[in-house]
């Protein structure tokens, strides 16, 4: 069924390279390109387009059309502008159109979030995206909605547009990137959305006294996804469910976990221009030259000792309290640590103080620097991710690509992508600990250091295992295309419509 190229609209509140506050933008800038170019079931060249708001910082977007959108009891102007993102396929260049919803009142501001009228800004955005489609004369098979900002789209399709034949064949997929951010608003928002009080109930949009845009997506989308199989299971439990576990359990049979990918052209140690010495899986030993360069750059003694890298947002989620608990014990070992990140002042000050207390052992750059990040990925021997929770995780995917061995807690996407190295079989690609406990983290680090120091041949196998993993966007795209077909089939069966 559906043995033809698909028409896919990917909707996100932020998209690289136009607007970014977090990892969602990276996904929205990468996955559509992979979807447009991947060969799947012998098919390629799916018609993939992207929709996002046109924020103040986005320049040179060309005019396409404009129209009024009835929203919050009055007409608002929606201007559609367009940019493109480029994708490469078999040596040819392809473009993915990016439609930008422009409205001066809602989007001509400094920054993307967080404003007092978020419900109105993104409620309008979702309505305008749907109103745009008949103006373009384009009917996507699937609308892929991302996070709470896009939650009203499935809701609107099953309420305001339910009887409209233009929209009747469209399936929706809703992806939860981080359940912690839910878009919860006062119940008066229902009127703004054009919905009656009958939607203020637990079976619909009510969420502990609020109206939840995240819950709108979860309840009304045809199929749900999140960014790893383990996180899909975790969010159905009270520990990780952010009070949404009940509604997620009800839809467990339609909830898929698909690990995000990384751009294998951008993150390639063989060609990365930011590295002192390029290398590949057959010449991984050249990593050492990058280590020595990193040590010089970070004012650490240039010695062939294990270097542990840490690149992260400095927030509670990332397990930094575990590192703090064992740092003095770690520093008694013959190792070095290189830290890059910014975030909460408490953790920024903590790492500054560690650097002072352990000169020549710890280097910390508070802030973010893309070039330095790549040099840490390439120059470190091991990479720490002791996260409290991690829906998917990006750092471990990049570190694997660069042959830098991840030491991670078994949660979310970390559990799906990193497996404990087995000396007997030679399998595995990292070191893993289960309990959120500083001693468990220390034990995992100790296992990594023991192998590194005592068996370089085995360490070489481990590095090669890591570098040979495939976490490219092409792999993720194939999985998403199957989910899209599942959503289309569900719509076809439920509505009695044949979708060719």
Swiss-Prot record:
ADP-alpha-D-glucose binds at residue 20. It comes from the Bacteria. PANTHER family: ALPHA AMYLASE DOMAIN-CONTAINING PROTEIN (PTHR45825:SF11), GRANULE-BOUND STARCH SYNTHASE 1, CHLOROPLASTIC/AMYLOPLASTIC (PTHR45825). It is an enzyme of class 2 (transferase). GO terms for molecular function: alpha-1,4-glucan glucosyltransferase (ADP-glucose donor) activity; alpha-1,4-glucan glucosyltransferase (UDP-glucose donor) activity. Belongs to the glycosyltransferase 1 family. Bacterial/plant glycogen synthase subfamily. It catalyses: [(1->4)-alpha-D-glucosyl](n) + ADP-alpha-D-glucose = [(1->4)-alpha-D-glucosyl](n+1) + ADP + H(+). Synthesizes alpha-1,4-glucan chains using ADP-glucose. One of its GO terms (biological process) is glycogen biosynthetic process. Keywords: Glycogen biosynthesis, Glycosyltransferase, Transferase. This is Glycogen synthase. Pathway: Glycan biosynthesis; glycogen biosynthesis. The gene is glgA. InterPro entries: Glyco_trans_1 (IPR001296), GS/SS (IPR011835), Starch_synth_cat_dom (IPR013534). Its EC number is 2.4.1.21.
């Amino acid at each position: 069924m559906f043995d033809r190229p698909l028409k896919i609209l990917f909707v996100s509140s932020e998209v690289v390279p136009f607007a970014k506050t977090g990892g969602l933008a990276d996904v929205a800038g990468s996955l559509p390109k992979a979807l447009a170019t991947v060969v799947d079931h012998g098919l390629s060249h799916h018609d993939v387009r992207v929709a996002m708001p046109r924020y103040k910082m986005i320049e040179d977007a060309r005019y396409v059309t404009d129209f009024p959108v009835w929203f919050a009891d009055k007409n608002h102007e929606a201007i559609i502008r367009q940019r493109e993102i480029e994708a490469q396929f078999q040596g040819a260049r392809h473009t993915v159109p990016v439609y930008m919803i422009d409205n001066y009142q809602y989007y001509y501001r400094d920054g993307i979030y967080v404003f007092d009228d978020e419900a109105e800004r993104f409620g309008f955005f979702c309505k305008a995206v749907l109103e745009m489609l008949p103006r373009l004369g384009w009917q996507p098979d699937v609308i892929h909605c991302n996070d709470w900002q896009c939650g009203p789209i499935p809701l609107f399709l099953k309420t305001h547009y339910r009887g409209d034949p233009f929209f009747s064949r469209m399936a929706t997929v809703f992806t939860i990137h981080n359940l912690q951010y839910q878009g919860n608003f006062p119940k008066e928002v229902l009127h703004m959305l054009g919905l009656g009080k009958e939607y203020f109930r637990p079976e619909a949009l009510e969420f502990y006294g609020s109206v939840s845009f995240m819950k709108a997506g979860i309840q009304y989308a045809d199929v749900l996804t999140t960014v790893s199989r383990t996180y899909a299971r975790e969010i159905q439990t009270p520990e990780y469910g952010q009070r949404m576990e009940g509604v997620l359990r009800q839809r467990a049979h339609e909830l898929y976990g698909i690990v995000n990918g990384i751009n294998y052209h951008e993150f390639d140690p063989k060609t990365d221009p930011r590295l002192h010495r390029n290398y590949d899986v057959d010449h991984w030993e050249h990593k050492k030259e990058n280590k020595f360069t990193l040590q010089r750059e970070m004012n650490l003694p240039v010695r062939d000792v294990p270097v542990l890298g840490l690149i992260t947002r400095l927030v509670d989620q990332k397990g930094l309290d575990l590192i703090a608990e064992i740092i003095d014990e770690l520093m008694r070992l013959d190792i070095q640590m290189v830290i890059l990140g910014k975030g909460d002042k408490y953790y920024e000050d903590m790492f500054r103080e560690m650097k002072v207390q352990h000169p020549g052992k710890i280097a910390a750059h508070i802030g973010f620097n893309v070039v330095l990040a790549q040099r840490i990925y390439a120059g470190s021997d091991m990479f720490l991710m002791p996260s409290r929770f991690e829906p998917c995780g990006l750092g471990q995917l990049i570190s694997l690509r660069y042959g830098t061995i991840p030491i991670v807690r078994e949660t979310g996407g970390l559990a799906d992508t990193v497996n404990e190295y087995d000396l007997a079989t030679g399998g595995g690609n990292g070191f893993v600990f289960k309990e959120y406990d500083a001693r468990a983290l220390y034990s995992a680090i100790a296992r990594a250091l023991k192998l590194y120091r005592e068996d370089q041949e085995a360490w070489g196998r481990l590095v090669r295992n890591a570098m040979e993993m495939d976490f490219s966007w092409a792999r993720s795209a194939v999985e998403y295309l199957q989910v899209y077909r599942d959503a289309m089939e569900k719509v076809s069966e439920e509505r009695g419509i044949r979708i060719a």
